Curated annotation (Swiss-Prot):
A biological-process GO annotation: glutamyl-tRNA aminoacylation
Record: residues binding ATP: 34-36, 40-46, 229, 259-260, 267-269
Family: Belongs to the class-I aminoacyl-tRNA synthetase family.
Keywords: Aminoacyl-tRNA synthetase, ATP-binding, Cytoplasm, Ligase, Nucleotide-binding, Protein biosynthesis
Signal sequence segment: none
Pfam families: tRNA-synt_1c, tRNA-synt_1c_C, tRNA-synt_1c_C2
Name of this protein: Glutamine--tRNA ligase
Intervals of motif 'HIGH' region: 33-43
Domain of life where this protein originates: Bacteria
Length: 556
């Protein structure tokens, strides 16, 4: 699907009108992550939106790091975010850091002080919260609100020069403590933080608040359309106030859209961190995580994520997207690209008693039956093979076409075999089958034309390559993420989200490279886990099942 879906028209219409009216000559968008964690599928929606709009309107897009909170930020996150954006298939026009503008932001703060639009306040964080009031009760003015300009300037200089402790003073905007919008009740613009910054070191001990820094960053960079999620809608009056009162010529426009919400998925950074810290997963790139790193390790393709984000579009109305929709686009991508191979997840040994001992032959099997250009591979076959345990039943129900005593099945691209005996252990479990084969059925068809309903995949015992195979289910059982349930959400963590089995794959798979993807015949799509496959030991992650009943909603 392309980018021109109806649900994103409201943003495009705004941009079109802005260009027509001459308000802006060129479109500049930005993706502005804070480098304090890893990107997730919700960020991917914003990335695709901003880069696609810039591309459609022949504009530019900035990758900007909102690095104004040194205690939580790290170069590690900067590099991982850059890698994720590139992996998704995008190249930014300008790489920017909020910290590069600290001097200019300080100058704008001084400008507001001299205009009488900002003041230094000595109230504690708790007192500021108390003075702010509520949605139904107006706030009350700080006792420090009417300090004169000279005193405010000297105190702010002192804050900058390290004369005060963390939390001892803040710089606040002087707006309206009775405003119905709580964000306009003298918000904090600067706070003291004696913390080393990943980019500026120890040069600064005061740092701008997000609501002050963000509009300034957009204006400084010449951003025209600052696209963000709906939780910032109530912050837009403050965004516009900062631009206006700082008297900046460039006037970016903030536009809000609904954030991505998905079934069986949490995207709160706090909740994701809790999953990592409490060892529900093995890191931020765990294949069950909705992070870009996790999706990548799981085997998702950049194209499938881009197509998903385009298909869901953007709107003002919040909604829940079925997580199966993401799987739909992934499956659609892998169906075309992934080579086919056979893998046995729960091995049951089969001895073909009338097959010559010591003989090995090979069968040519297509890598993709829908794409002749994918070529063929040679697969060895001999007297002993593995099939899946679930492909045999001693006492099957009606219309069971797989293997059972006396029944004949087709081995994919090989021979017909018939079960003659089931060998059991002392507990009565079937541990081995005895079968005979029909030499005339070579290639999987019999010259006498007899029909065989069941076709089984198999692997030659002598050349089988051991593999650990990881089968994933949704990490979160709750359909919808609920705000403010930081602890309760753990009650919905799926204890069976990972199942590990020891199986076998074809001999050619020993040469597989990290992140290569395959369709395991009848099992689904799998990828080699490059992080865990070491010293010749292969680990495969199931990316997604072969089929699903999910269909794209008509309005998409």
């Amino acid at each position: 699907m392309g980018d021109n879906n109806n649900s994103s028209n409201f943003i495009k219409n705004i941009i079109i009108e802005d260009l027509k009216s001459g308000e802006y000559e060129k479109v500049v968008t930005r993706f502005p992550p804070e480098p304090n964690g890893y990107l997730h599928i919700g960020h991917a929606k914003s990335i695709v939106l901003n880069f696609s709009l810039a591309d459609e309107f022949e504009g530019k897009v900035n990758l900007r790091f909102d690095d104004t909170n040194p205690s939580k930020e790290d170069v590690e996150y900067v590099e991982s975010i850059k890698e994720d954006v590139k992996w998704l298939g995008y190249n930014w026009d300008n790489l920017c850091f909020a910290s590069s503008y600290f001097e200019r932001m300080y100058e704008y703060a001084v400008f507001l002080i001299k205009k009488g639009k900002a003041y230094v306040c000595d109230l504690t964080a708790d007192e500021i919260r108390e003075y702010r009031g509520t949605l139904t009760k107006p706030g009350k003015e700080s006792p420090y609100r009417n300090r004169d300009v000279e005193e405010n300037f000297k105190l702010f200089e002192g804050m900058k020069n390290g004369e005060f402790k963390d939390g001892e003073k803040v710089l606040r905007a002087k707006i309206d403590m009775a405003s119905p919008n709580i964000n306009m009740r003298d918000p904090v613009l600067y706070r003291i933080a004696h913390a080393s910054h990943h980019n500026t070191g120890d040069r600064w001990c005061i740092y701008p608040m997000y609501d002050f820094a963000h509009p300034l960053e957009d204006a400084i960079e010449g951003v025209t359309h600052s696209i963000c999620t709906l939780e910032f809608e109530d912050h837009r009056p403050l965004y516009d106030w900062i631009i206006q009162e700082c008297e900046i010529e460039n006037r970016p426009k903030q536009i809000e859209f609904a954030r991505l919400n998905m079934t069986n998925t949490v995207m709160s950074k706090r909740k994701l961190k809790q999953l990592v810290d409490e060892n529900f997963v093995d890191g931020w790139d765990d294949p069950r995580m909705p992070t870009i790193a996790g999706l990548r390790r799981r085997g998702f393709t950049p194209e499938s994520i881009r197509n998903f984000c385009r298909a869901i579009g953007v709107s003002k109305a919040s909604s829940i997207v079925d997580s199966q929709m993401l799987d739909y686009f992934l499956r659609d991508d892998l169906e075309k690209e992934a080579p086919r191979t056979m893998a046995i997840l729960n091995p049951l040994k089969v001895v073909i008693t009338n097959y010559p001992e010591g003989k090995t032959e090979t069968f040519k099997i297509e890598n993709n039956p829908d794409d002749a250009s994918a070529g063929v591979r040679e697969v060895p076959f001999s007297r002993e093979i593995y099939i899946e345990q679930e492909d045999f039943m001693e006492n099957p129900p009606k219309k069971y076409y797989r293997l059972f005593p006396g029944n004949e099945v087709r081995l994919k691209s090989a021979y017909f075999i018939k079960c003659t005996e089931a060998i059991k252990d002392k507990d009565g479990n079937v541990i081995e089958l005895r079968c005979t084969y029909d030499p005339a059925s070579k290639g999987g068809n019999s010259p006498d034309g007899r029909k065989v309903r069941g076709t089984l995949h198999w692997i030659n015992v002598d050349t089988a390559i051991p593999a650990e195979i990881r089968l994933y289910e949704p990490l979160i059982l709750e359909q919808q993420e609920k705000e403010g349930e930081e602890d309760l959400f753990l009650d919905h963590v799926n204890p069976n989200s990972l199942k590990v089995v020891k199986g076998f794959v074809e001999p050619d798979m020993k040469h597989v490279k990290s992140d290569e993807k395959f369709q395991f015949f009848r099992h689904g799509y799998f990828v080699l886990d490059g992080k865990c496959s070491k010293n010749g030991e292969l680990v495969f992650n199931r990316i997604v099942s072969l089929k699903s009943s999910f269909k794209i909603p008509e309005n998409k």
